[in-house]
């Protein structure tokens, strides 16, 4: 019986081909560096919608603090620019449902009971058709981030981007092995999608300073700890830019801690 292939512990993590070769870009990360090939990598921007990032959006109306999203959006823009410069495709997710909320599920769905957007609308019927409804301001991406021709924009009806979407087939058709995550919320849709990717054999990397949590900042830290311990790797935007050989677009004196 053939023994499984093993690699020296001082080599970076990451996908290797049949000859044991890893991607040529090595990204500093926790718990160890990870190698990637831009040709088999996607940048995933999760749910940077008015609902999750803007005053007056769903999270704000449901009582969550969105005051810290501005700097995160700026760092997401840097990650997107770096990916484009390196030839890495960008995929934008938008979470939400049809205006009649059929896609959200009725009382027979746990989503009906757990979705804070749906609960907020039940408490405030005047918000019906406003929160996370396709075509609404709430559903739209924030003005500061704009998909470009060649990007992929994909809707999703649940926290994980793999659930009831063509994400997996889209990635496999392109030979993708590695997913770099940014977006909102670290502890909900980002972590859910990265976890599902792990179970489908994708290498998942989250750029910590280009994500924002729903809830207290401790949930952001806990999600990152969970990811780096069990499901993936944690890096930051400056390291991503540097590894790709892309000039940093950080403003002078910016705090790049992740």
Swiss-Prot record:
Molecular function terms in GO for this entry?
A: hydrolase activity, acting on carbon-nitrogen (but not peptide) bonds, in linear amides
Q: Does the keyword Plastid apply?
A: no
Report the coiled-coil segments.
none
Q: Which cysteines are joined by disulfide bonds?
A: none
**Which keywords appear in this protein's UniProt record, sorted alphabetically?**
Hydrolase
Q: Which residues form the active site?
A: 47, 156, 189
Q: Does the keyword Hydrolase apply?
A: yes
Q: Where is this region: Disordered?
A: 1-23
The record, for CDD domains, names: cysteine_hydrolases
Q: Which BP terms from GO are recorded?
A: nitrogen utilization; uracil catabolic process
EC id = 3.5.1.110
Reaction(s) catalysed by this chain, per the record, are: (Z)-3-ureidoacrylate + H2O + H(+) = (Z)-3-aminoacrylate + NH4(+) + CO2; (Z)-3-ureidoacrylate + H2O = (Z)-3-aminoacrylate + carbamate + H(+); (Z)-2-methylureidoacrylate + H2O + H(+) = (Z)-2-methylaminoacrylate + NH4(+) + CO2
InterPro entries in alphabetical order: Isochorismatase-like_dom, Isochorismatase-like_hydrls, Isochorismatase-like_sf, RutB
User: What is this protein's function per UniProt?
Assistant: Hydrolyzes ureidoacrylate to form aminoacrylate and carbamate. The carbamate hydrolyzes spontaneously, thereby releasing one of the nitrogen atoms of the pyrimidine ring as ammonia and one of its carbon atoms as CO2.
Q: Which family does it belong to?
A: Belongs to the isochorismatase family. RutB subfamily.
What the entry lists under NCBIfam families is as follows: RutB (TIGR03614)
**Protein's name in the database:** Ureidoacrylate amidohydrolase RutB
What gene does the UniProt entry assign to this protein?
rutB
